[in-house]
C-alpha cells in the first residue's frame, strides 16, 4: 500500500509529498499521522536543511476527506477522538511554523480547508497560476485550525479574515499574492521547478 506522505532527500532539501492523488490529497487520519511523522524525522535530520511541501497529482490538498469523516460519523465518534484529531492537525501546523527549518510550499490546483492552512503555515510559497484556495469549514459545520485565526489578521486584517472564514469564498493565486499570502505565482508547469530553486537558496 502506498504511503500517504512520501519523503525524498535532494541536495539538502527534503521533499514531502502528500500522496493520495486519487482523492486530490484529501486529509484522513493516516495522512495526518504520516505527515506528523515525516516532519518529525525531517526536523531531526541534520542532512535536511529545507523542507519542501507539495502534493502529488492534480491538487496540493483538497482538505478533509469528507467520505472518511462521514463514515466515522455513521459509526459514532467520541468527543475524545475529535479532540485527538484536532490536536494532531495542530501539531502539524506547529512543526511547519515553529520548526527550525524553513518550509517552502509548492501549491498547485486546489488548496482547501486544512490544505489551505498548511500552505499558509509555510514560510515561503510558490503558487501555480491556476491554483484556487478557500475555507469551506463553516459551511460544513466545522471550524478552521492551523492557527489561521491568529495568522490571517496579521497579514490581511480583521475584516478580510472574517470574509475568508465566514463566507468561504474562493481565491485565485493572483489575489492571494496581492493580499500578501503568496510569494510567487508562476505557470502551473513551473511550480515545482521554481519551488526547488527557492528552497535551494
Could you tell me what each predicted segment is?
Residues 16, 20, 34-35, 53, ...:
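Terminal peptide-recognition signature
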Residues 21-24, 58, 63, 130-132, ...:
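A short, glycine- and basic residue-enriched loop/turn
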Residues 94-201:
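Crotonase-fold acyl-CoA enzyme core
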Residues 31-34, 85-88, 191:
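Hydrophobic alpha-helical membrane-association signature
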Residues 55-95, 111, 141:
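Glycine- (often His-adjacent) and acidic-residue-rich active-site loop
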Residues 1-56, 94:
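Conserved CoA-thioester-binding segment of acyl-CoA-metabolizing enzymes
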Amino acid at each position: 500500500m502506498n504511503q500517504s506522505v512520501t519523503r525524498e532527500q535532494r541536495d539538502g532539501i527534503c521533499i514531502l509529498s502528500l500522496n493520495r492523488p486519487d482523492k486530490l490529497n484529501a486529509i484522513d487520519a493516516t495522512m495526518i499521522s504520516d505527515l506528523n511523522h515525516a516532519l518529525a524525522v525531517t526536523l531531526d535530520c541534520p542532512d535536511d536543511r529545507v523542507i519542501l511541501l507539495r502534493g502529488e497529482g492534480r491538487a496540493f490538498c483538497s482538505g478533509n476527506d469528507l467520505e472518511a469523516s462521514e463514515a466515522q460519523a455513521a459509526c459514532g465518534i467520541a468527543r475524545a477522538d475529535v479532540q485527538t484529531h484536532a490536536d494532531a492537525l495542530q501539531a502539524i501546523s506547529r512543526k511547519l511554523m515553529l520548526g527550525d527549518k524553513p518550509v517552502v510550499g509548492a501549491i498547485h490546483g486546489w488548496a482547501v480547508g486544512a490544505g489551505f492552512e498548511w500552505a499558509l503555515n509555510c514560510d515561503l510559497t510558490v503558487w501555480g497560476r491556476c491554483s484556487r484556495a478557500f475555507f469551506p469549514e463553516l459551511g460544513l459545520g466545522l471550524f478552521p485550525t492551523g492557527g489561521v485565526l491568529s495568522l490571517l489578521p496579521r497579514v490581511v486584517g480583521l475584516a478580510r479574515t472574517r470574509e475568508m472564514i465566514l463566507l468561504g469564498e474562493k481565491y485565485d493565486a493572483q489575489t492571494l499574492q496581492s493580499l500578501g499570502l503568496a510569494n510567487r505565482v508562476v505557470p502551473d508547469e513551473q511550480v515545482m521547478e521554481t519551488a526547488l530553486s527557492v528552497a535551494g537558496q
